[in-house]
Every structure is written in C-alpha cells, then in structure tokens.
A protein has these predicted regions:
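Solvent-exposed loop/turn segments at secondary-structure junctions
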Residues: 19-21, 56, 61-65, 120-125, ...
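Sec/Tat-exported extracytoplasmic proteins
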Residues: 106-109, 139, 166
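Long, acidic (Asp/Glu-rich), low-complexity accessory segments flanking structured domains
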Residues: 1-52, 65-108, 113, 172-174, ...
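Acidic, His- and aromatic-enriched active-site or binding-groove loops in soluble protein domains
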Residues: 91, 95-98, 136-151
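Structural recognition of the beta-strand scaffold that forms the well-ordered cores
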Residues: 11-16, 55-59, 114-118, 162-166
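Short, intrinsically disordered low-complexity segments
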Residues: 153-168
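Internal, conserved structured core segments that host functional sites
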Residues: 112-135
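C-terminal active-site rim and adjoining tail of enzyme catalytic domains
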Residues: 165-214
C-alpha cells in the first residue's frame, strides 16, 4: 500500500481478503476433528496471511464460556471469552488476539491498513447474551486503531489503522461502521440495496455473497 497515493479513496481499491480468516489457527481440541473436516477454510494464520498481502479479514466472534472450580470454595466460576468461531466450531484464536496481531503488524508496517468484516456467529448451543457488551469493550480498548467509516475515506486517513465493519449491532453508533442489508442473492440487481453506516455518514454497498453448498 505504500505505493498508493494518500488521496486515493479506499472504496476504489480491490483489497485481498479471507473468509473465516481465523480457521488457519486450527480449532480447540474438542472441535479439531470435525472442524478440520467441515469448517477449515484457511491454511495460514493472520500473521501469515498478512505477510502474503491479505488486508481484509472475516471474523465471526461469539462468547465462549468455561466453568472452573475454585478448590478453596468449591464454587464454579464462569470465564467468558470472545472466541472466533466458524459455525459450531471454535478456532484457537480470540477476537482480542486478532487485534494484537494486527496492532503489531501495523506498527511494523505503518503505511498499511486492515479491514475487519465481522458478524455475531450465533448458536443455540452458546449463550451470546453478553456479546454486544464484550464486543463494544474490546473495540473501545483498541479505539486508537479504529477509524470511523465514511464513504470518502482515503488511504492516507486509514494508514496504520483498522476499519471495523460489523454486520451486527453492539451499540447505537458503531466504532467503525455497520453493514445493513447484507445480501446472499445470485442476481446482481438484488445485491445493491445494502449500506455501510458510520457515526455520521453512510454509503451504498453492493454485496456479492451468493454461495451454493453441494
């Protein structure tokens, strides 16, 4: 990205990205066998993807609960983590962990930028009731990196930082942008009604996400 002019609009670029980006880390032990067979879409982790030029990352966080027993009181405590999932399968990376990797990558390469497209990977088998609060807290902790979406956002404004676009809301106004009207249509005419809404501005979006599982 160092070769691209600062005043070039980000929306005019073709940016390499990865689907279910964190599956390259593999899955937690209980999900390894089925996850590798059904849900693994990447062979490289985020650092390795960055090294080969990937700058847009599809993340699917949900709340993972672990119950532990304190030996002194014999009471169970619940630890909640924003784990990255693909469907029912938990990868070995967390939402916060991805930000740590990208922070290090941007500090080493300040002319670059990253885009995160995220959604709540809901499941009837998990309690996601704290998802909104946990996502908002994680993004607030990394607010120095996050850029507010606007349709005329330029490369120069985004260098060294991250544009976070969420398909699900976690607070009234986004930290980055909200994608509204995500489409799964095969027909081009039906792919156009989507929008990206930032804190104060919004832009139209054509979503091409048609797929056929056979």
């Amino acid at each position: 990205l160092a070769r691209i002019d600062d005043d070039r609009r980000v929306c005019r670029l073709s940016i390499p990205g990865t689907h279910d980006a964190c599956t390259g880390y593999g899955f937690l032990p209980q999900d390894t066998l089925a996850g590798n067979y059904i849900a693994r879409t990447q062979e490289l982790n985020i650092s390795e993807q960055w090294a080969v030029g990937v700058r847009a990352f599809d993340l699917r966080p949900d709340v993972r609960e672990e119950k532990s027993t304190k030996s002194s009181k014999k009471a169970k405590e619940t630890k909640r983590t924003l784990q990255i999932y693909h469907g029912e399968f938990a990868t070995q990376q967390t939402f916060n962990g991805v930000f740590n990797v990208l922070r290090d990558s941007l500090q080493a390469h300040p002319t670059e930028f990253a885009i995160i497209i995220m959604q709540h990977e809901r499941s009837a088998n998990r309690d996601g009731s704290t998802w909104e609060a946990m996502v908002d807290y994680a993004l607030a902790e990394n607010s120095d990196l996050i850029v507010d979406f606007r349709p005329d956002l330029t490369v120069g404004q985004l260098r060294g930082r991250i544009l976070v676009l969420s398909r699900d809301t976690y607070r009234p106004t986004p930290r980055g942008g909200y994608i509204e009207g995500w489409r799964f249509d095969a027909e081009v005419d039906w792919q156009k009604p989507a929008t990206i809404r930032g804190y104060a501005m919004e832009g139209t979006l054509c979503v091409q996400d048609f797929y056929n599982m056979t």
